Amino acid sequence: MQVTETLNEGLKRGYAIKVTAAELDAKVNEKLAEAQPEVEMKGFRKGKVPMALLKKQFGQKVMGEAMQESIDGAMNDHFTSSGDRPAMQPEVKMTNENWKEGDDIEVSMSYEALPDIPDVDFSAIELERMTVKADDAAIDEALGSLAETAQNFENRKKGSKAKDGDQIVMDFLGKVDGEAFDGGAAEDYPLVLGSNSFIPGFEEQLVGVKAGEEKAVTVTFPENYQAENLAGKEAVFECTVKEVKKPVPAEIDDELAKKFGAEDLAALKGQIAERLEAEYAGAARAIMKRSLLDALDDIVDFDLPPSLVSAEAGQIAHQLWHEENPDVQGHDHPEITPTEEHTKLAERRVRLGLLLADIGQKAKVEVTDAEMSQAIMNQARQYPGQERQFFEFVQQNQQMQQQMRAPIFEDKVVDHVFAGAKVTEKEVSKDDLQKAVEALEEE
């Protein structure tokens, strides 16, 4: 077996691989010998079929497997001895297209090698971590929101008109073309005006009604309405308003706290403070992570595999095009050519991706089974009632597992770098933190 270098420019590599006919024949004989003990053929006991007969009967079938295994073996030996790591799947072509049995196998292999990644002195990286304390105003605001969610409704004075935010209790009957339809009727139905829980335009027409009033509400079902027989059709709902109620926020006291699982109001305030500060810390971490990535991008430089940059630039361009053209589904659109800006962003992403992967490998960072299970459970909650199916889907889908593992791995590597960097804390206001987050989102 011979491997001859044909290209070595930057990260581009090319090799000519030759597997001799004798080596291939030996591989075929080896595979036939492995199979011989299990082969049954008329006139012979199991495992006693002569090799010559086996070769005549199964040689052609085994030949293809032997060729593939020989080429794969040559490639694996090359990568082991050279230390090269291909950036993408190597391109392998058979160069003697008129090959026949008894000829040597000649193939060409080309790929882009992953670059050598320089070590980074984490202690030379200076970062700032914003810290925010949950003040009384923020806690009171959160308490007010909780009180609103726990609000009650009480009857307005007789003759009062319903306002946005009020709850009305009504009977209604919906008709399309004069005919009632399934699901279009209810009695004593409570509806909060402005909640947008009904068809667009329905609730607005009930603002101003009084208890005891009857009102016909005319609306048009959306074109994408789930019930196809109603989609896009005009309907008239005959509504009888029985009660008009105003919202009464819950009192902010120990009773409210108990509704939310706290022992008393002081305990609830403590829980809110912890939650707020956890949210602030998460936002501050995102800001510091961006600062870290910017710093790494500035201090580290190495050659990038063109194929990875090209693929990433294409993906960026494709994603941004769809964000600007949300009505276009799938790939039925003109060819999208990445711009210089897309390529520049792709270079940053590829550089940082390779660097973080290298740092993680050297630091032996691993994603544990427990961390993966937690991530799957968190995402499964987005599919109520289908959690088990989602869990099984992920277990059977390696690509999905990798998509979920990648951000966990990245965050663990980032935390590893944080631990070695010079990090100073700076106490700021909630507004300053919010401005920093908004600036981050605008980039």
UniProtKB/Swiss-Prot annotation:
It comes from the Bacteria. It catalyses: [protein]-peptidylproline (omega=180) = [protein]-peptidylproline (omega=0). Coiled coil: none annotated. Gene3D superfamilies: 3.10.50.40, Trigger factor ribosome-binding domain, Trigger factor, C-terminal domain. Keywords: Cell cycle, Cell division, Chaperone, Cytoplasm, Isomerase, Rotamase. It is an enzyme of class 5 (isomerase). Residues 165-250 form the PPIase FKBP-type domain. Its EC number is 5.2.1.8. GO terms for molecular function: peptidyl-prolyl cis-trans isomerase activity. It is found in: Cytoplasm. The keyword Hydrolase does not apply. GO terms for cellular component: cytoplasm. Consists of 3 domains; the N-terminus binds the ribosome, the middle domain has PPIase activity, while the C-terminus has intrinsic chaperone activity on its own. Involved in protein export. Acts as a chaperone by maintaining the newly synthesized protein in an open conformation. Functions as a peptidyl-prolyl cis-trans isomerase. This is Trigger factor. It comes from Roseobacter denitrificans (strain ATCC 33942 / OCh 114). The gene is tig.
